[in-house]
């Protein structure tokens, strides 16, 4: 079972990296402009939701919680606090960093 999960993880590694990049882009945009366009925000919410739902399957429960925190920050009325969103995205990235190499 572990070998099968490892193969799936490796196959989808690029997608995980792309998802982190999108979340970082949203956090950077919010920090720089203090705005977040609805299309970018919607894409970031969807991405964080997908990550929260899938990372636990690989035993990355702390990453699941971090992705859920990002999703909740983005998916409430009003803009998230830029510093808080950046901290949450950084935390998710740090948790996943050891698992992102080929």
Predicted features along the sequence, with ranges:
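Extended, amphipathic alpha-helices with heptad-repeat/coiled-coil or helix-bundle character
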Residues: 38-76
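A structural signal for long alpha-helical coiled-coils and helix-turn connectors
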Residues: 24-31, 52, 59, 71, ...
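Sequence/structural signature of long amphipathic alpha-helices
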Residues: 69, 80-83
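Residue-level signal for short amphipathic helical patches enriched in basic/charged
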Residues: 11, 15, 58-61, 77-80
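Long, amphipathic alpha-helical coiled-coil segments characteristic
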Residues: 1-45, 83-100
